[in-house]
A protein has these predicted regions:
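Strongly charged
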Residues: 2-33, 37, 44-156
């Protein structure tokens, strides 16, 4: 057993505009080369577009979209006796949130729109309506876990 102390959990940063602790994680994930103001502008432009399109508050639409993308199970590789099995495992809440943000950004970057704010806006709105590439990624992950349910007893 390790003699070192566990690192204390970091206090989540709260967004100054929408009072959300998920939004700064999205902004930091979008950021390239330390240009945080550019990333903030992209995200806030996308949320402003959500305000004009949606009937709810944009932060509520964003949170609902993230909840729709969050996976509940995933597969992990487990080597048993020379064979590698894809074992379905439940996903912890902080990992599911991180995966949802990652899938949202990846799906946004693959879109064909001109501006990144348009890409993120469209992907968030699609996820809010249970459509889009990020939702498809979640469904593929769940299908993979479902098809490998027989190996669930290899869980660790």
């Amino acid at each position: 057993m390790s003699r070192k102390k566990r690192a204390p959990k970091k206090i989540p940063i709260v967004d100054y505009k929408f009072k959300s602790n998920v939004l700064p994680k999205l902004i930091n994930s979008i950021m390239y080369d330390g240009k945080k103001t550019v990333a903030e502008k992209i995200v806030y432009d996308a949320l402003d577009k959500l305000k004009t399109k949606g009937k709810e508050e944009p932060i509520n639409i964003f949170n609902e979209a993230i909840n729709n993308i969050k996976p509940t199970v995933e597969v992990r590789s487990r080597r048993v006796g020379g064979a590698t099995y894809q074992v379905p495992v439940e996903v912890k809440s902080n990992r599911s949130q991180a995966l949802a943000l990652r899938w949202l950004i990846d799906a946004s970057r693959k879109r064909k729109d001109k501006k990144m704010s348009d890409k993120i806006f469209n992907e968030i709105y699609d996820a809010y309506q249970n459509k889009g590439s990020a939702i498809k990624k979640k469904e593929d992950t769940h299908k993979m876990a479902e098809s490998n349910k027989a190996f669930a007893h290899f869980r660790w």
